[in-house]
UniProtKB/Swiss-Prot annotation:
Residues 24-107, 169-187 are cytoplasmic. Interacts with GET3. It is a multi-pass membrane protein. The keyword Ubl conjugation does not apply. Belongs to the WRB/GET1 family. The chain crosses the membrane at residues 4-23, 108-128, 152-168. It comes from the Eukaryota. The lineage of its organism: Eukaryota, Fungi, Dikarya, Basidiomycota, Agaricomycotina. It comes from Laccaria bicolor (strain S238N-H82 / ATCC MYA-4686). This is Protein GET1. It is found in: Endoplasmic reticulum membrane.
């Protein structure tokens, strides 16, 4: 794959992650992780929740005055279940925090980190050459910092790609926003 397309795809993927949102991707990835690993803690949490709800439902049906012993036993059971659920929730939150750190690191490496590496690795290689005389004395800026004169450097190409992708996003948002406004006005 050519350097030109590789850089464009890297910039596009980075912007796509930005558009979707890292937290949305984190939640999707964590849900998938829980399904694939079949986490025992998550299964226990679900079972404990349903057990607490069933016990609480029975507790609400029991009269505290007429059947005090049964009511007290159910109340202790609900309280114990809630305490166990709190402990389990803190364990799951700790696990999710660890997963979040790893996931965010992976996203950064796969988007921004790869762009830095590609920019550094190909810093002296031109992405493409410009026809002579098109930009006159400003052609050196397009080759900045290390590409040969008369060419476009990786850094400049990354900036141009990002600008085009962000502009494309704005155009799509404006077009969909106007069409949605039209639907709301006409109905």
């Amino acid at each position: 794959m050519s350097l030109l397309i590789t850089i464009f795809l890297l910039v596009f993927i980075t912007q796509l992650v930005s558009w979707i949102g890292q937290t949305v991707l984190l939640e999707l990835a964590y849900a998938l992780y829980l399904r694939l690993t079949r986490s025992a803690a998550f299964a226990r949490q679900q079972a404990l929740k349903s057990e607490i709800l069933a016990t609480k439902s029975e507790l609400l049906k029991t009269s505290a005055q007429d059947q005090f012993a049964k009511w007290a036993k159910l109340r202790r059971s609900v309280d114990k279940g809630l305490a166990d659920l709190e402990k389990l929730n803190s364990q799951i939150a700790s696990s999710k925090s660890s997963f979040s750190l790893k996931f965010n690191s992976a996203i950064w490496i796969l988007t921004t980190g790869v762009q830095f590496v590609v920019g550094w690795w190909y810093r002296r290689q031109p992405v493409f050459y410009l026809p002579e005389g098109w930009f006159g004395p400003l052609a050196w800026w397009l080759a900045f910092p290390f590409a040969p004169a008369g060419s476009v450097s990786v850094g400049v190409w990354q900036m141009a790609c990002k600008r085009v992708v962000v502009l494309g996003e704005r155009v799509v948002k404006d077009l969909t926003g106007e069409s949605l406004d039209y639907v709301h006005v006409s109905s």
